[in-house]
Amino acid sequence: MLRTRTAGSLRPADAGQTVTLAGWVARRRDHGGVIFIDLRDASGVSQVVFRDGAVLEQAHRLRSEFCVAVTGVVEIRPEGNANADIPTGEVEVNATSLTVLGESAALPFQLDETAGEEARLKYRYLDLRREVPGNAIRLRSKVNAAARGVLAGHDFVEIETPTLTRSTPEGARDFLVPARLQPGSFYALPQSPQLFKQLLMVAGMERYYQIARCYRDEDFRADRQPEFTQLDMEMSFVDADDVMALSEEVLRAVWATIGYDLPLPLPRISYADAMRRFGSDKPDLRFGLELVECTEYFADTPFRVFQAPYVGAVVMPGGASQPRRTLDGWQEFAKQRGHKGLAYVLVGKDGELTGPVAKNLTDAERAGLTAHVGANPGDCVFFAAGTAKSARALLGATRIEVAKRLDLIDPDAWAFTWVVDWPMFESAAEATASGDVAVGSGAWTAMHHAFTAPTPESEATFDTDPGSALSNAYDIVCNGNEIGGGSLRIHRRDVQERVFAMMGISQEEAEDKFGFLLEAFTFGAPPHGGIAFGWDRIVALLAGLDSIREVIAFPKSGGGVDPLTEAPAPITAQQRKESGIDAKPGKDGA
């Protein structure tokens, strides 16, 4: 072995022992005729001192991030020199020999200083030597182990599903891989293991899980990755309560890795209530500021802006003192989200209403408004009007922004909820308008995905009354982040074909894209359901980090580029020829 102890393990009880450490030079300090280094490895840091002879002479060549092995005697630090900030702070190693295992070139950035993200990603192997990035990756491993432990205890089978499959319409663009042996044909990287895990239920596996890599070729979005990880689970012969209860066990074990005892069972809120009260299907419950319905209140208003299908409000406590420039900034906030602006009323200290909206209201509307919305003198009341979905989305975003500006969010709090009773379908036009992808060519598209089972009450009528149909779907939300989503699945061919038809997927297309699944359903498919957790997001929350890039060993930049390897990159003419990427498909090709 190149070392006998790890740097972070030394304690006063080890005094007098001869040890060999190996790691990196985190810092070097020259104190007259003595050189000190902080030697870092994965376990922590120990101070090493070079006092005399040849070993002191050798130490003069050490620089930051040299990889070294040191042998020496563990000693108690002189009085007054202890460092209470580190576990090894009471001891040091008096070096008797030094071996340089690897020299370091001049660093592109100092590891103990702030560096730009581009540099950090380009030299990610250096970035991961730092405490916070390195610990985030180690935490991820602990989280994986915690989840596996729970699932193993419930007789789950860990099964790997293919990462080279066929392209199916799942809501985002596929990454395509040319099939060299069938020129003109392509594999697709999976957006999720959805279809394969359902087939595993048909196969009688009953309890499946996988820490699965998924791929989606999406447009630039600030905190998305083209490849990401899910904890994917599926179970046969279960209802929604069974899936949610087991999911809660997994979450409790995962949050225990940071010392938090998650109280169970977790609360539940219906999709309709979440949208009505919080303007979001992933509500942040760490603070109040609920939306207030004002549609009926303004039913007879002469103010044209409020003559809309929906009018709602959210109150900003103390917001009446905002300067005009700040209030104008709220208009820009709304425009960035696709709205014309954000109406507001200021409540004076004497209760008088001012602002551009107030003058357009009737005396009766002004008289009762503060009581209706729950505002106090000194508050600002923001309004949105339009379709319920659009206006609530703006108010929900405003609610979050108000909470941030007023420092209402406890950063140490954990607020979980299940969102249940989801609509089975949404208008394809509304889905597209809000930035989602509408699968199929019909007027309606699946709210979750096409394989989500309707509730028993909606099964007979979902294709004649799609706007009222509910699905057996459930999302788990933590601190305003969707961290998992699942549902009971369709397991009958006739129901699945009706859903496809509802979405405008023709029988021919359904057979072409999903024929293997439809056929499987004819061989005694069991009722089944499952869930997929956004593993990157969960680990980021646990680590207290804002971006999922921080918890991925080698992430892509926001534009999907890897600064380290410079991927994606052009291919050679020979590779292009061999791949058959330019070949025209045969008669049976896609």
UniProtKB/Swiss-Prot annotation:
Region listing for Disordered, in residue ranges: 559-590
Positions with a binding annotation for ATP: 216-218, 225, 482, 534-537
Key word Glycosyltransferase present: no
CDD domains membership: AspRS_core, EcAspRS_like_N
One cellular component term from this protein's GO annotations in UniProt: cytoplasm
Molecular function GO terms recorded: aspartate-tRNA ligase activity; aspartate-tRNA(Asn) ligase activity; ATP binding; nucleic acid binding
Record's keyword annotation contains Ligase: yes
Enzyme kind, highest EC tier: ligase
Subcellular location: Cytoplasm
Biased composition (Basic and acidic residues): 575-590
Record site feature (Important for tRNA non-discrimination), residues: 31, 80
Swiss-Prot/TrEMBL GO biological process terms: aspartyl-tRNA aminoacylation
Keyword annotations: Aminoacyl-tRNA synthetase, ATP-binding, Cytoplasm, Ligase, Nucleotide-binding, Protein biosynthesis
Protein function: Aspartyl-tRNA synthetase with relaxed tRNA specificity since it is able to aspartylate not only its cognate tRNA(Asp) but also tRNA(Asn). Reaction proceeds in two steps: L-aspartate is first activated by ATP to form Asp-AMP and then transferred to the acceptor end of tRNA(Asp/Asn).
Family the entry assigns: Belongs to the class-II aminoacyl-tRNA synthetase family. Type 1 subfamily.
Subunit text: Homodimer.
Name of the featured protein: Aspartate--tRNA(Asp/Asn) ligase
Native organism: Mycolicibacterium gilvum (strain PYR-GCK) (Mycobacterium gilvum (strain PYR-GCK))
